[in-house]
Amino acid sequence: MTTDTLKDAPAVAVDFESFYGKDCDIKSLGQWNYLNNPNCDIYLMGVVGDGISWAGHPKDFDWSLLHGKFILAHNLSWDGLVLAKLARDGVIPSHVQFAGGGCTANLSVYLGAPRNLAGAARELLGVDVTKDLRTWMKGKTWQDAVEAGRADDLREYVLRDAQTCFNLWQKHAHEWPEHERELANLTMTAGWAGLRIDQKLAEHAAAALERVMWEARNDIPWADGDVAVLSIKALGEHCRANSIPPPPSTSEDDPACEAWENKYGAQFPWVAAMRNYRKANMLREKLRVMTERIRPTDGCMGYGMKYFGGHTGRWSGDARFNVQNLPKGEMFGADLRGCIVPRPGKQFIVCDLSQIEPRVLAWLCGDTQLLDQLLNGVPLYEAHARSTMGWTGGNLKKENPDLYALAKARVLGLGYGCGPAKFVEVARTMAGIAISQQVAARTVESFRSSNRKIIALWNRLQTDFRRSSGNAFVVELPSGRKLTYRDVSSSGGWTARVERGGRRIPFYGGKLCENLVQAVARDVFAESLLRLRRVGVDVVFHVHDEAVCEVAPGTDPHEIERIMSITPDWLHGCPLAAEAVVTTRYCK
């Protein structure tokens, strides 16, 4: 179905109920595989609109009633696929055409409410919506419900959900700007279209990972029994048997875990084996999901991505395969990013906004000295070194690569209140340099003393936040959008709720500044996506500030760079830049 917005078309909400059970649900299978699973019976449908209130099997509905209507659903990403399948199967007659579609789950998160229907209804309508019946239906068919005397309850349930969706739209749709609706729809339709997967490469990579896991398993003492290889209990027992402390965690992203592995890896081969097994297993699982979700119809894999996945408005991953968090490069003979390829006759242009957040931060705090250098073509990290680190030479990256790396670490790591201990790790991961705690402390002090405008922005945000105690702290963004911190409180530390009815989160000046910068950068990137769409460029997915465009061969990458580096009117004076590469595989 189309999701283009058509104003003034009457809105009608729909809700579908389908069989789900163990290993037969969207989370396990992905939307396409679940919808086409023989056990996925769409047994009930609710329809609510002005003059319409109906519940029953989709085959029994008079679909002509929805011709020319604007279709609402609380999860249109799913319900839209159901409607498309019903049309392909002939349940919806070919002459029935919808005016467009809107998703009230996306509307809800834009307004700061929970994504789920019960939470959205509670926070935006003030009503309680129970999902107990849906829980009861797990593993049960429509016939099971009939035999249990719950058929009428289910009809009331599906009607109530459709009515709640309709009420959410009627009450709050005017608060959702058209361009944000377009962004939500682009996110959804890109996920429907999916990504083409090089299945042979994915299978070859999976085989390589299996070999790595087999070799690692041979070096793990407890792996030859019935105990799971990744058993935390077995790991702890073996550590104690060897008189070493167990790792503080087994998360590969935890610096403490990495430090533990580095300390004991040379002495105990099973430490490195555990690390290799864990990483290879993680990659293999991603590849398994990728290959299992390849559609036989076109060789593509549908994927999920959440519009407004966070408080700042940035997107987030969804549905077990997170396109925003794929590991870079090859590891153990597996390159997950390289498994994503253009459709036949196409190529990728991967283009990202260069250092968008530091540029936005400079603009927000009024660092005209840095901005003027950027306008004159000086690279960002060199401009920072000239402004605050005493660099007076020529090309910094060529003449003093160590200072360039430190400037990069400062720019990327110190703009939001990072302290010395954390900066040691930030410098390593973001700039590839190793520094001591002493050097980190001096660097943090130097940065703060030479970037007083950034510090002033932290302090201003923190002061205004604390003055809002007992109320909401609202930050109006340059784009006109608002960041809202609800129910600010000093009890037990300064906290607020970013989601209506959500948990409390601590905030301080640097964190508020980071949120502000990320939100502005998100709006800049969002405008880039809309501009690309309006000139016919197909963005198949995007990662943070990077757009993966699927285009015809010969498309000029410099034109993509030009489109993405246009400064919005509301950010006048902030020089943007973009960098693109042409590739036949996703590689950045």
Question: How should each PLM-predicted stretch be described?
Answer:
Residues 37-47, 51-58, 63-174, 184, ...:
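Active-site-proximal helix-loop-helix substrate-binding element of RNase H-like nuclease domains
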Residues 245, 390-535, 575, 579-588:
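Conserved catalytic core of nucleic-acid polymerases
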Residues 554-560:
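Short, conserved charged micro-motifs
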Residues 1-30, 37-40, 44-47, 112, ...:
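Conserved "right-hand" nucleotidyltransferase catalytic core of DNA-directed polymerases
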Residues 172-183, 524-547:
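Active-site palm subdomain of RNA-directed nucleic acid polymerases
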Residues 77-92, 108-111, 237-241, 354-368, ...:
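Short active-site loop/helix that positions an aromatic residue
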Residues 548-552:
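Short hydrophobic/aromatic beta-strand micro-patches
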Residues 431-433, 562-572:
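A common structural junction motif
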